[in-house]
């Protein structure tokens, strides 16, 4: 996973670029309990499908959340609902898209007030472009 680093936004929320089914066991070993897909199938040739990743998650006992986004439909139609996914009572969430940028911007939009300001700062420390969240919030 060194070529596709995990960016730890909080103790419970991390983002990264495309995940492969072969990485799921390692993600579980790192304490992740939920994998959230923010990438539509077939965005790039050869990327694993959501069904393939869901099967790998099921095999290893992780929840798989489908919330695919493009820049055209960002942030999707259920930001309030997806906010709950970013606040697990136990375990950790890994959200992924092509680079981690959409996932990080989505997480930022689920935060409010001072927490949102802090979320911008955390994402920007990783070099994540936060323009999508800034334009909407």
Stretch-by-stretch model annotation:
Residues 1-93, 105-137:
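Cys-dependent protein tyrosine phosphatase-like superfamily
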Residues 97:
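Short cysteine clusters
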């Amino acid at each position: 996973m060194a070529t596709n680093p995990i960016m730890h936004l909080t103790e419970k929320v991390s983002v990264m670029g495309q995940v492969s089914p072969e990485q799921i066991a390692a993600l579980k070993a790192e304490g992740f309990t939920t994998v959230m897909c923010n990438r539509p199938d077939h965005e790039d040739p050869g990327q694993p499908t959501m069904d393939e990743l869901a099967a790998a998650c099921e095999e290893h006992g992780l929840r798989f959340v489908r919330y695919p986004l493009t820049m055209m439909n960002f942030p999707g139609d259920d930001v309030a609902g997806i906010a709950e996914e970013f606040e697990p009572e136990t375990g950790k969430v890994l959200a992924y898209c092509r680079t981690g940028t959409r996932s990080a911007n989505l997480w930022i939009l689920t935060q409010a007030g001072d927490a949102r300001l802090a979320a911008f700062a955390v994402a920007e420390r990783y070099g994540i472009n936060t323009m999508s969240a800034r334009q909407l919030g």
